Amino acid sequence: MSFSKWGGKPSNSSEKQKASSTPTVEEINRGVGDIGLNSEQNEGWEVYARKPKNKGGSSAGKQWAPQNPSPKAWGNQNTKAWGHPDVGKKSGTRNNAGSGRGSGNNWSTPSDPQKLARPHLYDGGFPSSAPVPPALKNGWDWSSRVASAHPKDNSQVAAAADDDKASEHDAEDNELDFLDESDDDLHSDDFDSDVGEMSYETRKKNPWFNQLFHSLDSLTVTEINEPERQWHCPACKGGPGAIEWFTGLQSLMTHAKTKGLRVKIHRELAELLEEDLRQRGTSVVPPGEVYGRWGGMEFKDKEIVWPPMVIIMNTRLDKDENDKWIGMGNQELLEYFSSYAAVKARHSYGPQGHRGMSLLIFEASAVGYIEADRLSEHFSENGRNRDAWERRSARFYPGGKRLLYGYMADKKDIDNFNQHSAGKSKLKFEMRSYKEAVWNPAKQMREDNQQLIWFKNKAAKHQMQAKALEESLSLVSEKHRQTLEENKIVRLKTKMHHEQIKEEMEFQEQFFKDQIKIIHDARTAREDNFEKTQQEQREMVKQSNANTASVEDHRVRAEKVAKFIKLQDKEMEEFVEERENLMRTHDDRIAALRRKYWEEEVELERKFDLELSKLMEKYSPKQSDEVNSSGTM
């Protein structure tokens, strides 16, 4: 390897080693000449690891120059590589031309992309440091290099070769540095992201897309939409996805709409493809659809005789005494074909009598036409249709019975039928469109029938629901009646219990009142007895004073009596006061007891009201749920 790449001077030992290990230009040319594009090496790719270039700090003499992305990095590719159905059958193929060196002629990209492969070059024993770079625009131009290398010795030639190899590695590194998948790298002269004001044709001529649309212009719409045709993505040019094949234009379109890298250029490609296909009057055929192979059948309308009629031939029987033909009557003809619901029958008569030509007229409706067509099909299945009659087939069964022939009537048949009729005796008819007279009404009948079936099913469903609701209502009504009876019994029992409790409470009240009255009476008797005792004692003291003999005794005795009376009055006053206090305390106790009683009674009423509310909540929702559930059955 030449040290000129690193900017240093080679030593003598390195020159000797280089002279012995580095091949000359002629050897390289011979090696390149032996390379064949159809060799077995083209079946796959060789993977090479990049060799570090900064060794020992000797990289100061070489500076890298940035390279702008250019669509020419793909080389001179054949246009058919974008739209040829046989291109790239293997996933390992690559459209980039292999890099190599020639002695006189410049290398160009092969026209057949299947033969693209990287040639194995002899590089002096050193492994390649980068993947295969894109082919140069004008090749390696070895002629000028070899011409300038002739005056030099072998070591100088080898050094030049190594310099070229170093330049090649630098170009590869710069090319790899270019492969940044962000949209920032695309803001160059090759791709303008501001395409809002550019016309469609101008956007198509963008160097990124020009080759693809040039290839599309050379193909027909059928060829473009071939599902097996393979495509490259031009927006992935120079990137890892450049070698990927997309089978069918739908796959390429999906890739362009969903790719997460180089978003702007991929979306631009999708828009241009859609616009191009729209201008061609087509669109992308989704996978699984066959394009342009079969054509559908169109409904062709026809004119039919209205009302529907069936011609019955060979209906005359024999000649009468006037030598005129007689034949089948109207009612007889209707009875013969009673299973086909004909409305009426007519026969054609001429100068010779019955012409053997009869008509079955059906209802002027789609059903009538279907019945007439069914009769005509019956004759066709038995080989007695119009063609058989016109071929003059057998007219009689074995044994002499006549064979009847029948077919749908057309205008010529009716005109023939009316040939000998005049005025009102002519059969009236009109020619109507089959689509308007039969197809549309039959279609409407089919739709009405489907709707009728739907309504019948809906009515049956509603009837089932109504029946279920009726049964549920009957059950709920019966349960409601039972509940009312049970509630009536409960209310009656509750009322009886209330009356019983009331009687018991009144009895208890009367009992306690009697007890209180007894206590009050006893108390009053004791008070009366106490007062009587006090009065008797006072009278006794007064009587004792009246029996004294002397005045002095009388006076002393009177003082004692007065003192006793005064003391007794004082005691009685204290008694009355204490009695009043005691009665007041008693009244307060009774009032407190009554207040406590009323409070407890109010609390009991509230508790009863709460329990009653809970009981009502317990049973009311259950009944409503049962009604709702029965209503939704």
Curated annotation (Swiss-Prot):
Q: Any idea where this protein resides?
A: Cytoplasm, Perinuclear region
Q: What is this protein called?
A: Protein SUPPRESSOR OF GENE SILENCING 3
Cite the InterPro entries for this sequence: SGS3, XS_domain, XS_domain_sf, Znf-XS_domain
Its biological purpose is as follows:
Required for post-transcriptional gene silencing and natural virus resistance.
Q: Name one Pfam family in it.
A: zf-XS
Instruction: Show the ranges annotated as biased composition (Polar residues).
Output: 10-24, 56-67
Q: What keywords tag this UniProt record?
A: Antiviral protein, Coiled coil, Cytoplasm, RNA-mediated gene silencing
Which GO annotations describe the biological process of this protein? Answer: defense response to virus; regulation of defense response to virus; regulatory ncRNA-mediated gene silencing
Region labeled Disordered — which residues?
Answer: 1-133, 147-193
Where does this protein have coiled-coil stretches?
565-606
Assembly notes: Interacts with begomoviruses protein V2.
Q: Where is the composition biased (Acidic residues)?
A: 170-193
What's this protein's family per the entry? Belongs to the SGS3 family.
Additional detail: Does not move between plant cells.
Extract one GO cellular component term from the record.
perinuclear region of cytoplasm
Q: Where is the composition biased (Low complexity)?
A: 93-109
Where is this protein chiefly located? Answer: cytoplasm
